[in-house]
């Protein structure tokens, strides 16, 4: 039954426009070129503006445009840093509610909890035994994170890109929507797929990256850094459940410069350009049109315009999250059903890998 389901799944996958593989942009694939899409998000609780514009919004579009997509709440990745079990359990449900409220539809895509599909860790160990230590130590994110922690990072933090590769390859994914900061990790995924195929015969597709159209959303208080939930400055990050008053306050305090005109010049006017990019994204307008409409407006007034646009965008999402969070049983059922569907796809792939490696 699982094999029949997988054959059926293989026949019904397709994907998107802004493809990127390695340093060169790839051509836009035709629908029949796309076999499977996978992406994941850590259970950080309620997403912020950067999560929404950088990933979730494009996920909704992708599931609507294509027949078969998997989205995972990657809780195994989250424990590479210390977690309170009670908070983690709630954060998983909060992220589930947020994804559903934003438009992720379990009938159009498979939404599941990573830790409930044991094949992820099984494949991860096999791939871990194929990658050299220096390769992981030279990844940018490992260097950056261990520098912050004074080289006290865990083995899990070092090897999480291999688990990320297993997440993707386990479903024989052909395309993966990623942000700019994940391109190097996707190169590792591609290399591991090729290494496995070279050793055991052609088995895994070599997945391609899809860069999201929205670049990193910057911190409202420091436009040189990306927006982050862990930012100690609470005015730097807009959560999608913030009240209208909180959103207005955060945009009022957003860092700009001493020039009052609204322009889009990311290299020289990072703060104002970040506001323009956010405004364009939530309003569904080109940056040029946003700048044109803002002619004659000073940045103080413009901050309120952007705040109003964000409030309008998030109002229905916020309301839906509040309703969904009141129904814990429903959220748990969504994850349970999604995890069962994911396992139905993962199990036969993992069994074939075990045969190729010599375990069966």
UniProtKB/Swiss-Prot annotation:
Cross-referenced Pfam families, in alphabetical order?
Answer: tRNA-synt_1b
Q: Cite a single GO BP annotation.
A: mitochondrial tryptophanyl-tRNA aminoacylation
Molecular function GO terms recorded? ATP binding; tryptophan-tRNA ligase activity
- Give the EC number(s) under which this enzyme is classified: 6.1.1.2
For this record, the Gene Ontology CC terms, alphabetical, are:
mitochondrial matrix; mitochondrion
**Matching InterPro entries:** aa-tRNA-synth_I_CS, aa-tRNA-synth_Ic, Rossmann-like_a/b/a_fold, Trp-tRNA-ligase, Trp-tRNA-ligase_bac-type, Trp-tRNA_synthetase
Look up the transit peptide and give its residue range. 1-18
Catalysed reaction, written as an equation: tRNA(Trp) + L-tryptophan + ATP = L-tryptophyl-tRNA(Trp) + AMP + diphosphate + H(+)
Residue spans crossing the bilayer? none
Enzyme class (EC, first level): ligase
Q: Where does L-tryptophan bind?
A: 167
Q: Where does ATP bind?
A: 42, 48-51, 179-181, 217, 226-230
Cellular location of this protein?
Mitochondrion matrix; Mitochondrion
Report keywords, A-Z.
Aminoacyl-tRNA synthetase, ATP-binding, Ligase, Mitochondrion, Nucleotide-binding, Protein biosynthesis, Transit peptide
Regarding protein family, the annotation reads:
Belongs to the class-I aminoacyl-tRNA synthetase family.
Query: HAMAP family from the entry?
Result: Trp_tRNA_synth_B (MF_00140_B)
Q: Which NCBIfam families match?
A: trpS (TIGR00233)
Per the entry, what this protein does is: Catalyzes the attachment of tryptophan to tRNA(Trp) in a two-step reaction: tryptophan is first activated by ATP to form Trp-AMP and then transferred to the acceptor end of tRNA(Trp).
Protein name as it appears in the record:
Tryptophan--tRNA ligase, mitochondrial
């Amino acid at each position: 039954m699982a094999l029949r389901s997988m054959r059926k799944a293989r026949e019904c996958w397709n994907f998107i426009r802004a493809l990127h593989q390695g340093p060169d942009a790839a051509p836009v694939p035709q629908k029949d070129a796309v076999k499977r899409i996978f992406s994941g998000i850590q259970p950080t609780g309620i997403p912020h503006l950067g999560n929404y514009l950088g990933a979730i919004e494009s996920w909704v579009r992708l599931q609507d445009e294509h027949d078969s997509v998997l989205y995972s709440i990657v809780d195994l990745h989250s424990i590479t840093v210390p977690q309170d079990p009670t908070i983690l359990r709630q954060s998983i449900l909060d992220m589930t509610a947020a994804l559903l409220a934003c438009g992720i539809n379990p009938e159009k895509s498979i939404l599941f909890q990573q830790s409930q599909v044991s094949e992820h860790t099984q494949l991860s160990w096999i791939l871990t035994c194929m990658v050299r230590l220096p390769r992981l130590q030279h990844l940018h994110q490992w260097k950056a994170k261990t520098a912050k922690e004074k080289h006290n990072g865990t083995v899990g933090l070092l090897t999480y890109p291999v688990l990320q590769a297993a997440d993707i390859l386990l479903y024989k994914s052909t395309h993966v929507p990623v942000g700019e900061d994940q391109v190097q990790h996707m190169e590792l995924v591609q290399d591991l797929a090729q290494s496995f195929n070279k050793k055991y015969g052609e088995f895994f597709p070599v997945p391609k990256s899809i860069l999201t159209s929205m670049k990193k959303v910057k911190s409202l208080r420091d436009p040189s850094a990306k927006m982050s939930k862990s930012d100690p400055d609470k005015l730097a990050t807009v959560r999608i459940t913030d009240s209208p008053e909180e959103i207005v306050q955060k945009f009022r305090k957003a860092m700009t410069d001493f020039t009052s005109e609204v322009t889009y010049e990311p290299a020289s006017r990072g703060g104002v350009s970040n506001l323009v990019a956010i405004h364009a994204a939530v309003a569904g307008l080109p940056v040029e049109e946003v700048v044109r409409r803002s002619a004659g407006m000073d940045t103080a007034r413009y901050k309120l315009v952007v705040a109003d646009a964000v409030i309008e965008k998030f109002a229905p999402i916020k309301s839906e999250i509040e309703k969904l969070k009141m129904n814990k049983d429903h959220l748990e059922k969504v994850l349970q059903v999604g995890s069962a569907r994911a396992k139905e796809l993962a199990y036969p792939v993992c069994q074939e890998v075990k045969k190729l490696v010599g375990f069966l």
